[in-house]
Structure formats: C-alpha cells, structure tokens
C-alpha cells in the first residue's frame, strides 16, 4: 500500500530548492558553524547572481558587440530572458516570503494529520504525480549537464591532445566578465561564478514554481474533500438543524479557501505574470537558436532545454487547471446532491453555496491572464508560429 503523504512531503522539493542555495524559509535550528556555512554559500550565490546579471544586461546594452550575428543575439537573448525571469521570481519571493510562510503555516494547520482523515482527503491524489516528478528531475538533470558540459568538454579536448593542445577555457555562459577568464586562475574564478549563478537561477526558477504548485494543490485538496462530503449528505426535514450546521461548516470552509486563494494570487501574481512573458520569450529564442545551430551538441542541449522549459510551464498550468476544475465541482456536487429531500431552510442555504461556488477559483497573473491549460496551448501555438516563420526565413 502506498505511503500516505504528510504536509512536509508536499513542501519538501520546494523547500529543498532554496535550502540547497543556503536559504531556509522556515529557519530550522542548526549548529552555528553550519548556519555560517550555509549563510555564506547563500551570500556567494547571491553575489554571483547579481554580478553576472549585471554583466548580461551590460552586454545587451552594448548592442554593437552583438550586431551582425543572429546566433549571438538569440543566445544572449535566451540568457537575458532566463536571467530576467529568475531575478523577478527571486525579488518577488523575498518580498512575499513572510506572507508565504504564514500561508504555509495556515495550510499545515488545515492539513489532515491522522491516517484516517488523510484517506478521506485522498492526500496522495494531490501530491506531485510520478510524471510531474520525472519532468522536474529531467529539467534539473538537463541544467546540471549544461552546467558541467563546458568544463568536461574542455578537459577532454585537452587530454586527447596529451597536454599539447591548448586548453579551450569553455564556460557555462558566454558573458564577458570584468577579468580575464582565459587564464587558469581567472577561469577557475569565472567557473565558480558561472556555476553558483547557474544554480541560483535554476533553483529559484524551479523553487518558486514548486511553491505555487504546492499551495494550490493544498487548496484543491480541500475543495475536492468538500465536494465529496457534500455529495454524501442525505438531508431530511427531521434532521434540519444537523443538516444546516453541516452545510454551514462547508460554506465557512469554502470561504476560507477563497481567502487563501487570494493570498496565493497576491504572493505569486507578479511572479506568474513575469513567468508567462519570459517563458514565451525563452521558447522563441530557443526555437530560433536550435534552427540556426542545427544538429550538433549545443543544438541538442538547447532542444533538451526547450522541452524542459515547456514541460515546466505545462506542470504549472495543469495545477492552475486543477484548481479551476475542483472549485467548480463544488457547485456541481451541491446541485447533484439530494438537496430536494431537505427542509426549506436547507434548500435556501444550499443556494447560497451554489451561488458562492459558481465563480471558479483561479490562479491569475495579476488578474490579466488565468493560468490554465488553455494558456499553455496559446503559448505553444505562438511559439510554433514563430518557429515556422524563422525556419522558412533561414531556409531562404
């Protein structure tokens, strides 16, 4: 029998993305030496992030250095939009971290901790599916491969030449730094900066999305439970007070879910708006770069990255769709229940719930775009059209 998931299981991956950067949202007690170690690593990653982000931005501003090379423009554009997405996510996360912490504590209080209640809530149904976890593992694996590939390739080329060939000093990112990275010590420093910067933007990008999926799935779980409870009730005029008390508890819990969903939109609204814009730009840049580069190692790497980024946004969109579906299912469950067997008072009160549940709960990008599978389809359609136009242009 499959193990029933605890609340800690739900937030484990999201929390781990930031803990591996040295940032602990929950401030878990630890020895002073370990605290200094992880805090120092977080400072290193943050400094590397802002330093290299400034270099990327400077390179984009210095347009003359990219002019005449579509490949360079798209590669720098790809790097810039991925960097921009991570910066916006990080800033949004840090600004709203206390509110996210409060939201997490509230959801933990509501989470069913007894095994019997966990079965009623069907907690495992709302945990990250096996396919979703595989998407996340593949995404992270692709990022690790792209981070280590330049160093491994440089070493292999040097070793094949038996030390006679020049060391190529390949780096993760093509960004020019303020020091010479083609000397041994400079290369080591540049690679440390590249690696910590790469880990920072990947973990922040993935970690914030995981947090959004975690809290939205918790709300979806409670909505699903309310719908099941509503469908199981058998009201009658003889048990009017008991039935109305039960219905009142469902209405109150639904109102609580509405408030929590507003908190989710407050914390992740700007993040999702930036995520949607930068993801579309990323996919278009990767599509173009793959066409230009053709079938080589770098082209394959960017094809893998394209699939990973698209899959990541699909997973986010599917959680938004799940919340929409389960929130509307509550009104459907109320309508399909045996409400007509209840008292007149019960019938009036269930109308309140039906009216309240008519409007679906949605994860929206600042109220502009609703995150759903339809949004994912629109995004992929735009990317494909861009890809088709670029391919025809290149072939000419």
Swiss-Prot record:
Pfam families: 7tm_6. Residues 28-34, 92-141, 231-266, 318-396 are extracellular. GO terms for molecular function: ionotropic olfactory receptor activity; odorant binding; olfactory receptor activity. It is a multi-pass membrane protein. The chain crosses the membrane at residues 7-27, 35-55, 71-91, 142-162, 210-230, 267-287, 297-317. InterPro entries: 7tm6_olfct_rcpt (IPR004117). Coiled coil: none annotated. Keywords: Cell membrane, Membrane, Olfaction, Receptor, Sensory transduction, Transducer, Transmembrane, Transmembrane helix. One of its GO terms (cellular component) is membrane. It comes from the Eukaryota. Residues 1-6, 56-70, 163-209, 288-296 are cytoplasmic. The keyword Transmembrane helix applies. GO terms for biological process: detection of chemical stimulus involved in sensory perception of smell; olfactory behavior; sensory perception of smell; signal transduction. It is found in: Cell membrane. Its main location: membrane. Belongs to the insect chemoreceptor superfamily. Heteromeric odorant receptor channel (TC 1.A.69) family. Or49a subfamily. PANTHER family: ODORANT RECEPTOR, ODORANT RECEPTOR 13A-RELATED. The atypical heteromeric and topological design of the odorant receptors appears to be an insect-specific solution for odor recognition, making the OR/Orco complex an attractive target for the development of highly selective insect repellents to disrupt olfactory-mediated host-seeking behaviors of insect disease vectors. Odor-evoked OR currents are independent of known G-protein-coupled second messenger pathways. Odorant receptor which mediates acceptance or avoidance behavior, depending on its substrates. The odorant receptor repertoire encodes a large collection of odor stimuli that vary widely in identity, intensity, and duration. May form a complex with Orco to form odorant-sensing units, providing sensitive and prolonged odorant signaling and calcium permeability. Involved in the behavioral responses to butanol and 2-heptanone. Interacts with Orco. Complexes exist early in the endomembrane system in olfactory sensory neurons (OSNs), coupling these complexes to the conserved ciliary trafficking pathway. This is Odorant receptor 49a. The gene is Or49a.
């Amino acid at each position: 029998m499959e193990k029933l998931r605890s609340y800690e299981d739900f937030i484990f991956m999201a929390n781990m993305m930031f803990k591996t950067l040295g940032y602990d949202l929950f401030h878990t007690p630890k020895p002073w030496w370990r605290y200094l170690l992880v805090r120092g690593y977080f400072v290193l990653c943050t400094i590397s992030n802002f330093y290299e982000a400034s270099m990327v931005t400077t390179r984009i501003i210095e347009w003359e250095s990219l002019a005449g090379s579509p490949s360079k423009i798209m590669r720098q554009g790809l790097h810039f939009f991925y960097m921009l997405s991570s910066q916006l996510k990080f800033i949004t996360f840090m600004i709203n971290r206390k509110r996210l912490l409060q939201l997490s504590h509230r959801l933990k209080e509501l989470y069913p901790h007894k095994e019997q209640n966990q079965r009623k809530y069907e907690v495992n149904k709302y945990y990250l599916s096996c396919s979703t976890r595989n998407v996340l593992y593949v995404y992270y694996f692709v990022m690790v491969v792209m981070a280590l590939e330049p160093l491994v390739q440089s070493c292999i080329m040097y070793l094949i030449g038996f030390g006679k060939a020049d060391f190529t000093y390949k780096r993760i990112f093509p960004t020019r730094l303020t020091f010479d990275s083609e000397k041994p010590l400079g290369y080591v420093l540049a690679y440390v900066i590249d690696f910590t910067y790469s880990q920072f933007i990947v973990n922040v990008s993935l970690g914030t999305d995981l947090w959004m999926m975690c809290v939205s799935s918790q709300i979806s779980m409670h909505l699903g439970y309310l719908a099941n409870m509503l469908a199981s009730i058998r009201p009658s005029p003889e048990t009017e007070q008991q039935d109305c008390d039960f219905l009142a508890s469902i209405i109150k819990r639904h109102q609580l879910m509405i408030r929590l969903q507003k908190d989710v939109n407050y914390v992740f609204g700007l993040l999702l708006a930036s995520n949607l814009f930068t993801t579309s730009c990323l996919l278009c840049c990767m599509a173009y770069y793959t066409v230009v580069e053709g079938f080589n190692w770098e082209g394959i790497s960017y094809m893998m990255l394209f699939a990973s980024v698209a899959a990541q946004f699909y997973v986010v969109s599917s959680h938004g769709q799940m919340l929409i579906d389960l929130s509307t299912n509550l009104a459907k469950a109320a309508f399909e229940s045996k409400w007509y067997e209840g008292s007149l008072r019960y019938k009036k009160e269930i109308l309140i719930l039906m009216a309240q549940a008519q409007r679906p709960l949605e994860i929206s990008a600042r109220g502009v775009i609703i995150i759903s599978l339809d949004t994912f389809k629109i995004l992929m359609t735009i990317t494909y059209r861009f890809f088709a136009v670029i391919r025809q242009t290149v072939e000419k």
